[in-house]
């Protein structure tokens, strides 16, 4: 049976035949398709001459009936900033109802009780679903490093006659049915550049060139046994290859230039994927999740209203923080929300003290707000900024000149960045677990052997950036002039300023010749041997 024949047989299994015109309306196909399909179904033994389903049709019907569902809810929902700092995406509320609860209720409406929810990020917040709805939670421990292809691998033995559903969608009408006769993947009639597929005349999902535009991929799918087996085997193969760690599960549906399942097309207004704060605001401006601490803080700091906060975009860069770009009153800002566990690594009170010390000195990005308790920070976005290119010696000379000028200010704060003390502190975070590196103890001993020389030649300690790497030097245009701003002062403290020179070299992956060239750029009047050796020690 092809898709049209399956649709028509499905309609006849639900309601008795009256005439072809009504059947065309119910099935969504033309009179010509209905007439042709009825002949084929009779010929294949699925219908008798009275156009009633045969025992063969009923058997097919039962064999392909939906039995279970898998809801994918493990991911961060990175684009949902700032909501994802407080709530996993599946629990976002629309009209007072969590997305995942609506999905579960819609599944229950069509008789599906066997439901697996794959969780990871904030998994404990989903635990109530087990008691309230009888679902089974499956934990994906790799949610932070791998995409949902790996989530589906954990439940691949349950793919037969199963719906696969993302947790971040809101369906106006129930997208599930008591009966299905073929596998499908849901797309909408909306054209998006992000989509990889489009629907052709045969209702196949064929791939499109990047940014060529295709049907928006909703993410809901249904798999009958034959296709479930194929997808399960494909998932197993793909998950063995590291290049697919970041892949979506749909990767397992492709064979050459198309998906192995047919398209199910819905109107774009019937199914809404909620990926961003603003998409949630569009569908439900009164949603409880819109009232986040971050938005309230922005409004207070910038004397704004929630509706003034627009164009929210996640910024993935940063080792320890979750940051996002936003616009407020026609001005762009970046908000930093410290990541989990960063309070162990960074003293936010000390960081705030550093920003107080460098305020109004035109050294860093402009701070609109900083909280010394939780580390929340709002800075003005530097439009058109670029980072230093460590392979461009002109860039390097300008950055070293800027660094030298900062050091010449000899600013003071009340705390010190103790390099060797920090090494010992980081070891305490291991909780007694030995290093995975076999030569760690030997390397550590070599490093500590340098301490006497460093202590003897450190000189005066002043406010030092500590993280003066190329990416933290920003070139910006201000009033027609080029300026260099030094950003990210989380680790700054009192220390030998020459540590900053060493850090630039380390993160630039310089060899000795390049290190000496950088030292020459900083010490324009020459560098004595003792200082040069000390910088080598810091690099080591």
What spans do the regions from the language model cover?
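ATP-binding pocket architecture of kinase catalytic cores
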Residues: 313-420, 434-441
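An alpha-helical support segment within catalytic cores of ATP-dependent transferases
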Residues: 293-311, 411-466, 470, 476-478, ...
């Amino acid at each position: 049976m092809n898709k049209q024949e399956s649709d028509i047989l499905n309609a006849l299994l639900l309601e008795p035949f009256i005439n072809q015109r009504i059947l065309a309306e119910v099935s969504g196909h033309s009179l010509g398709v209905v007439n042709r399909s009825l002949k084929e179904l009779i010929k294949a033994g699925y219908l008798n001459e009275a156009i009633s389903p045969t025992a063969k049709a009923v058997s097919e019907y039962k064999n392909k009936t939906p039995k279970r569902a898998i809801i994918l809810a493990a991911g961060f929902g990175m684009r949902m900033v700032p909501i994802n700092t407080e709530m996993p995406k599946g629990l976002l509320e629309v009209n007072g109802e969590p997305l995942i609860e609506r999905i579960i209720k819609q599944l229950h409406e069509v008789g599906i009780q066997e439901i697996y929810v794959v969780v990871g990020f904030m998994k404990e917040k989903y635990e109530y679903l087990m008691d309230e709805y009888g679902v089974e939670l499956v934990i994906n421990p790799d949610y932070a490093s791998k995409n949902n292809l790996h989530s589906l691998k954990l439940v691949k033995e349950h793919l037969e006659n199963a719906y696969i559903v993302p947790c971040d969608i809101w369906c106006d009408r129930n997208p599930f049915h008591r009966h299905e006769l073929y596998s499908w993947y849901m797309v909408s009639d909306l054209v998006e550049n992000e989509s990889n597929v489009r629907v052709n005349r045969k209702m196949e999902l064929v791939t499109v060139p990047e940014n060529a535009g295709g049907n928006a991929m909703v993410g809901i799918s249904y798999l009958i046994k034959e296709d479930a087996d194929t997808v399960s085997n494909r998932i197993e193969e793909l998950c063995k290859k590291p290049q697919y760690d970041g892949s979506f599960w749909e990767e397992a549906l492709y064979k050459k230039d198309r998906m192995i399942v047919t398209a199910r097309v819905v109107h774009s207004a019937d199914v809404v994927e909620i990926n961003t704060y603003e998409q949630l605001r569009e569908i439900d401006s009164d949603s409880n999740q819109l009232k986040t601490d971050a938005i309230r803080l922005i409004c207070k700091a910038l004397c704004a209203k929630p509706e003034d906060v627009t164009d929210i975009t996640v910024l993935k860069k940063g080792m320890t923080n979750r940051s996002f770009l936003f616009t407020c009153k026609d001005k762009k800002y970046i908000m930093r929300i410290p990541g989990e566990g960063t309070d162990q690594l960074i003293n936010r009170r000390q960081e705030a003290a550093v920003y107080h010390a460098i305020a109004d000195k035109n050294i860093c990005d402009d701070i609109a707000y900083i909280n010394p308790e939780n580390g929340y920070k709002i800075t003005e976005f530097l439009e058109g900024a670029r980072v230093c290119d460590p392979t461009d010696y002109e860039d390097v000379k300008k950055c070293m000149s800027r660094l030298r000028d900062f050091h010449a200010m000899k600013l003071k704060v009340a705390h010190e960045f103790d390099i060797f003390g920090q090494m010992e502190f980081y070891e305490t975070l291991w909780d007694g677990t030995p290093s995975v590196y076999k030569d760690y103890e030997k390397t550590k001993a070599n490093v500590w052997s340098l301490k006497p020389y460093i202590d003897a030649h450190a000189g005066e300690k002043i406010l030092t950036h500590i993280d003066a790497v190329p990416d933290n030097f920003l070139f910006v245009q201000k009033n027609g002039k080029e300026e260099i701003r030094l950003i990210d002062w989380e680790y700054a403290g009192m220390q030998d300023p020459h540590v900053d020179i060493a850090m630039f070299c380390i993160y630039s992956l310089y060899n000795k010749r390049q290190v000496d060239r950088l030292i020459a750029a900083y010490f324009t009047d020459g560098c004595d041997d003792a200082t040069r050796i000390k910088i080598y020690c810091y690099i080591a």
